[in-house]
Amino acid sequence: RDHRKLGKELGLFTFMEEGPGFPFFLPNGMVLKNQLIDYWREIHKKAGYVEISTPIMLNQDLWHRSGHWDHYKDNMYTTVIDDVPFALKPMNCPGGMLVYKSQPHSYRDLPLRVGELGIVHRHELSGALHGLFRVRCFTQDDAHIFMTPDQVKDEIKGVAKLIDDVYSLFGFKYHMELSTMPEDHIGTDEQWAAATDGLVSALNELGKPYVINEGDGAFYGPKIDFHLEDSLGLSLIHISEP
């Protein structure tokens, strides 16, 4: 049941010494991957999402403004183009914010649900690499939802339902954890409290059990971690954030 062996045996994916941590998808793997992408687009369209695509590389100034440079630079790949420093994106969020800021919006447009299958790169230590579970390049299923404060609870519940629908289809079991403010974070205590309260309120209305994971939130916000079990009973994490 080792997925790395199955990947080769079934012609799904492989890894090469020329690119450690960077998966090569084979013909059968692309058939499966494209079917999953088609399904992703179908369910997101039904849920009221629009789809965008943002560049895999953006200038370093953006990463300073977003806070990623101060909190995540050791995990980022960088380069210089025409004397301007750039970085491969480790997360899709800053690009998604640029798209939103590119045109004016009215409160009547909200909630605005935006989905992206963005390719991200993260400098993982070689000893931590493990098949497709821990890689240096992967496609991240991301959603950025722009909303008013009074819409937060319903939107979080909507995301949780979408995740539950997908996991149920594939027969995954999961449990939820609420991860709160870490020591290394941006934003004020008041902003963190408001965001955390929104997640707690939504979780309570969902009526499903969850545990609180103190101090394990992202540096930019609290999050709900969906821990699912694979066929070997190992725990994997799917993250949903406000």
Describe the role of every protein-language-model region.
Residues W40, E116-L117, T139-Q140, I163, ...:
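Extended, hydrophobic alpha-helical segments in both membrane/secreted and soluble proteins
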Residues R1-E124, A128-L129, F133, I145, ...:
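Auxiliary tRNA-acceptor-end handling modules of aminoacyl-tRNA synthetases
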Residues M76, K223-H227:
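Short acidic loop-to-beta-strand element that houses the catalytic metal-binding Asp/Glu
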Residues S235-P242:
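Residue-level detector of conserved catalytic or cofactor/ligand-binding positions
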Residues E9-P27, R134-E190, E214:
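Conserved alpha/beta enzyme-core scaffolds, especially Rossmann-like or related mixed alpha/beta domains
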Residues V80-D83, M147-T148, E229-G233:
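Short acidic-glycine loop/turn motifs at beta-strand connectors
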Residues I37, R41-L58, L62, F170-D216, ...:
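Gly/Pro-rich turn-and-neighbor structural signature
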